[in-house]
Amino acid sequence: PSYSIGPDCYKEIPHVTRFFGKTAAVIGGKTAMAKAKKAMIDGVAGSDVKLLDFIEYGGDSTYENGDALIANPTVRDADMIFAVGGGRACDTGKYVADKLDKPLFTFPTVASNCASVTAISVIYNPDGSFREYYYPKLANHCFINSAVIADSPEQLLWAGIGDALSKEYEAVFSSKDDTLSHTPLMGKQISRICTDPLIEYGAEALESIREKKASFALDQVTLDIIISTGIVSNMMSTVDSYYYNSTLAHCVYYGSTVTEH
């Protein structure tokens, strides 16, 4: 995936998007957009890029919410889709952009998952239970604003560290009995580097987020959670050929969506 990281990375929006259009519909979570809005507006100030509107995505990555956005005239008229927020907001944005065949740019506001750079969307039913996977195209670029990440809830970074820690073990275990072709083999090998940065920098990254301060350690953990695991996901899953991206950790999570708790 193509990405930028840093406290001023939104200033790269005009340059990165220059070949894709001049107008963008921003869709995402209410809190996420509130935290990112000023930096996004400042990032495109003085450029040809116009942010048409900031539209709430509906709160969950369902086909119903995605289809409502697809029917929104502002979304339909925009040259580009900007998806802002956590995994479900990004997954919804991927579905919308794919169905409308528009360029997609993601703006993760939490480091809890790799959805902003993966070619898979987790789709839920309206009652919150897991429905299925949808396989969209990749986002054209991911903007990771480290100042916005530093202002996110500590428990979401903690969850992201746990999610990323499972990547190596799931990838290696689920593919252990198969002869892998080039792409999943590369994904398996990349999964082996997902663990060490979390162990080395995880505690310091959590301290940074408690203090609401960007840091080298927080950047390393953020990149591990979003980019490294995202690369593994893209290389180890396809629509119909193979799926080495999940074992017990994902099964427990998806099972929890259909139980009362």
What is each stretch, according to the model?
Residues 73-96, 100-110:
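A short, small-residue-rich loop immediately preceding and capping a beta-strand
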Residues 58, 84-86, 244-246:
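Active-site nucleophile and cofactor-binding loops and adjacent substrate-binding regions
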Residues 7, 29-30, 84-86, 107-110, ...:
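Fold-independent oxyanion-binding glycine-rich loops
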Residues 10, 33-37, 63, 88-95, ...:
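Short glycine/serine/threonine-rich phosphate/pyrophosphate-binding segments
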Residues 181-261:
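Active-site segments that bind and position negatively charged phosphate/pyrophosphate groups
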Residues 99-191:
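A glycine/threonine-rich phosphate-anchoring loop and its flanking beta-alpha core
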Residues 1-80:
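ATP/NTP phosphate-donor binding region
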